[in-house]
């Protein structure tokens, strides 16, 4: 029993916890944040501390119970110090016992911001300029650098204005009638020229070697096309003539009179086989065959 009583007495005399939520929210020092937890103390060595008067300072006269009362968000702010290998970002956390703490440790947040006197103050007039805000404009991140690296200059104006102009075509070389006549004569005699012959012809006609070579290449292409067209026309003409001759020969065989074979004249069956022919409207031939057969009998 004495041991149990001593144990209860020891528990009753235990010191209160110094890092509870109530102690943190109800701190009496307006410009400091309590860091009593061992892990929080260790994190302070890495640059996590509370800095008063950082870049993000809340405006006095903010959320309050009455319009003319003191601001609920004070000037106390906690910021993250510079960590090695981390971004330089300031995070402001405003604290006030009247606004953030209540009975039972429940945080109450007003539904709207009451304005004193019913007059809306402009944001620029309510927020004083802070030197720390100017330092935030110089923040750079790795993704910003990559975007700047791959950005392309955009040109203003019509979309077709900045296109590369098309290449100018070379003017077509024009030859004189005398040059063309001499080239045609030489082409009819010789379709291909050697390098020495081409140089001599170019010198005689006062032309360059490249001009003579190009002219002969174009002329050979034209000659091949004309030759192919002429051959095709000749082939079609020959086919038409052949079909016409076949039709005429067929008509002659049909209209040619049948000569009676002297051997078959006296035999009616052989004579009938000899005179087999397609059906025709000519009744005179049929009558002649019947008369000849009757005569043979």
UniProtKB/Swiss-Prot annotation:
Biological processes per GO annotation: animal organ development; regulation of transcription by RNA polymerase II
Pfam families on file: Homeodomain
One Gene Ontology molecular-function label: DNA binding
Subcellular location: Nucleus
Keyword vocabulary terms for this entry: Developmental protein, DNA-binding, Homeobox, Nucleus
Portion annotated as DNA-binding: 168-227
GO cellular component: nucleus
Main location per the UniProt record: nucleus
UniProt cross-references to SUPFAM superfamilies, sorted A to Z: Homeodomain-like
SMART domains named among the record's database cross-references: HOX
The species this protein was found in: Gallus gallus (Chicken)
Coiled-coil ranges from the UniProt annotation: none
CDD domains from the UniProt entry: homeodomain
Stated role: Seems to be involved in the development of cranial sensory innervation from peripheral ganglia.
Name used for this protein in its record: T-cell leukemia homeobox protein 1
Residue ranges, annotated region (Disordered): 153-174
Keyword Lyase: no
